[in-house]
Amino acid sequence: MSTSIRICSYLLLPLIYLLVNVKIAQLGESFPITIVTFLPVLLLLFLERISVKKLMIALGIGAGLTAFNYLFGQSLDASKYVTSTMLFVYIVIIIGMVWSIRFKTISPHNHRKILRFFYLVVGLVVALAAVEMAQIILTGGSSIMESISKYLIYSNSYVLNFIKFGGKRTTALYFEPAFFALALISIWLSIKQFGIKTPKTDAMILAGIILSGSFSGVMTFILFYLLEWAFQYLNKEAIKKKLPLALISLAVFLVGVVIAFPYISTRLGDLGTEGSSSYYRIVGPLVMVGYSLTHIDGVVRFGSLYEYVASFGIFNGADVGKTIDNGLYLLIIYFSWFAVFLSLWYMGKVIKMMINAFGDNRNFRVQLYLFTPVSLFFTGSIFSPEYAFLIVCPFILRKALNITR
């Protein structure tokens, strides 16, 4: 493949961020088709070599988890089993391909072109979110958001209803605020793989996350930035040479936290308020998780989630919820202790990485690997190509930039 074609192929990645939630077509009631539905094919554009061994390992793990779920999970709605299983297998294929592929290298003189496209995407979505927020403040509603939602994979009617009752959330080109924030953080990590400082873009991305109203997004951005401060300045060499800069940057960070404290404290308080989104995402489902870990019939077969969740009668707003908005809890409900052990194993790897990152966290390596488990707390729609793209895109760029550590 020629260099020019290769450049165009990688420029698809920032473009996909704009279109990731735009529905092209629909198969049945629960299978929207988007550009990332074809992600396995798109990955072939970047393919230089593939490790069949790694791919087989990934597919084998996926097959084992699927078999466990089928054998031990209780079926409450057999009609949705095939579709739900296909989605899980599809995600395994995408992750397996990204892990096993050696991507074509992006040459240094093309970095700026790709970065410009990412900057353009950030500018467009944050500007749109700002316009949506302005309309919400001025009119109490958002006809812009309502118009855009007609072209998205899922309706954001619950967000519009929330706004009618005085809430302030934006979604830009995405189907919900949490996914919007997740997309911005994914873009941010993609940009960071190029190893340059982008304070203006960082500020714009933070502004977009705040406009989304996603508490998970705000806290994740704060966590990742605080980690980077620690990795840069909490080592002997940096303390000797950069102490004033470290203190200034920490002071700026603390000022930001103080300004955001009323919002943070309010959202933390919501964790104890039944019916709030924070309660429904974190606290309410714990009873389901506990049941899945302590009862033989606690594992739910693919496709039966709605009925299982509804049986616990946990309120999401004024209605009984039927979905799980927490990916980690979803994995436990489907795979029980396997999900717990795999999560602990992965976090052990990340913690070991953190210990060795002080003074040497090349291109936000720790934050990139931490992003996968943290992202589980943003959404329950983790068995979707759209979610998978947000997770794997920064890894694709890291491998294409030949960052080995």
From Swiss-Prot:
Coiled coil: none annotated. The keyword Membrane applies. InterPro entries: Colanic_acid_synth_WcaD. The chain crosses the membrane at residues 5-25, 27-47, 55-75, 81-101, 117-137, 171-191, 204-224, 244-264, 282-302, 327-347, 376-396. The keyword Cell inner membrane applies. It is a multi-pass membrane protein. Pathway: Slime biogenesis; slime polysaccharide biosynthesis. Keywords: Cell inner membrane, Cell membrane, Lipopolysaccharide biosynthesis, Membrane, Transmembrane, Transmembrane helix. One of its GO terms (cellular component) is plasma membrane. One of its GO terms (biological process) is slime layer polysaccharide biosynthetic process. It is found in: Cell inner membrane. This is Putative colanic acid polymerase. It comes from Escherichia coli (strain K12). The lineage of its organism: Bacteria, Pseudomonadati, Pseudomonadota, Gammaproteobacteria, Enterobacterales.
